[in-house]
């Protein structure tokens, strides 16, 4: 519009009177440890659903995206570390695996290094399975694959990891992206304090 005024196409910029619109931040949902435990105790019976559940839980303890999880092979597991390429940032990442994540992978020695760790259906079917599993487990939140990533970031921060470390673990290029999770935690803390009973003094 400024260029149009400069080039005398229009006389006045109609946007001059418009103030900047601040978009309201959407609070990122995540699962707390009790909810993860709840899910782990109600693993689905069918093979497809079991695999989706295993992949989702692995995501909760590694922060890997759906794209990285579905293509993850056994050769990417190097001891207690998972190595993956993040297409979005065009960089390689190494994420340490804790005991829970390692148990979800299973015995890599007995597997073909080229095989995929998770044999899951297409994204839409995975979403359906997750939604159904969440309802059956009594989880009030909407289960989707990206929720596992939010969960990993938030649980890492609440467990004492600093922002820089978490941003490196989940492959964020900008620290500001990871700060969204820290803000969620701060707001939850503030709400918890505000909900304490009031004492009249």
Describe the role of every protein-language-model region.
Residues 6, 10-66:
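Basic, Lys/Arg- and aromatic-enriched nucleic-acid-binding interface segment
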Residues 17-25, 29-35, 62, 71-106:
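Conserved tyrosine-mediated DNA breakage-rejoining catalytic core shared by Y-recombinases
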Residues 51-52, 121-123, 140-160:
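Short basic/aromatic active-site micro-motif
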Residues 57, 61-68, 132, 149-173, ...:
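C-terminal catalytic core of tyrosine-transesterase DNA break-rejoin enzymes
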Residues 76-81, 140-141, 161-180, 187, ...:
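Short, polar N-cap/turn motifs at the start of nucleic acid-interacting alpha helices
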Residues 86-90, 102, 123, 170, ...:
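Catalytic-site neighborhood detector that most strongly recognizes the C-terminal catalytic loop/helix
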Residues 87-106, 112-132:
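C-terminal catalytic core of Y-nucleophile DNA break-rejoin enzymes
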Residues 107, 120, 197-201:
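C-terminal secondary-structure termini that scaffold catalytic or DNA-interacting sites
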């Amino acid at each position: 519009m400024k260029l149009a005024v400069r080039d005398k196409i229009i006389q006045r910029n109609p946007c001059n009177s418009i103030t900047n619109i601040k978009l309201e931040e959407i609070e990122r949902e995540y699962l707390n440890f009790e909810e993860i435990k709840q899910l782990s105790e109600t693993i689905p019976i069918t093979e497809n659903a079991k695999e989706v559940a295993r992949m989702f839980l692995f995501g909760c303890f590694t922060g890997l995206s759906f794209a990285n999880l579905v293509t993850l092979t056994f050769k990417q597991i190097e001891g207690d570390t998972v190595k993956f390429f993040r297409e979005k940032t065009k960089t390689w990442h190494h994420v340490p695996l804790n005991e829970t994540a390692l148990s979800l992978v299973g015995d890599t020695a007995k597997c073909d290094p080229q095989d995929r760790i998770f044999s899951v259906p297409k994204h839409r079917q995975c979403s359906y399975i997750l939604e159904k599993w969440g309802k059956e487990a009594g989880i009030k939140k909407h289960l989707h694959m990206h929720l596992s990533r939010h969960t990993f970031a938030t649980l890492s921060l609440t467990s004492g990891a600093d922002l820089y470390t978490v941003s490196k673990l989940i492959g964020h290029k900008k620290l500001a992206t990871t700060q969204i999770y820290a803000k969620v935690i701060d707001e939850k803390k503030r709400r918890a304090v505000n909900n304490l009973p009031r004492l009249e003094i």
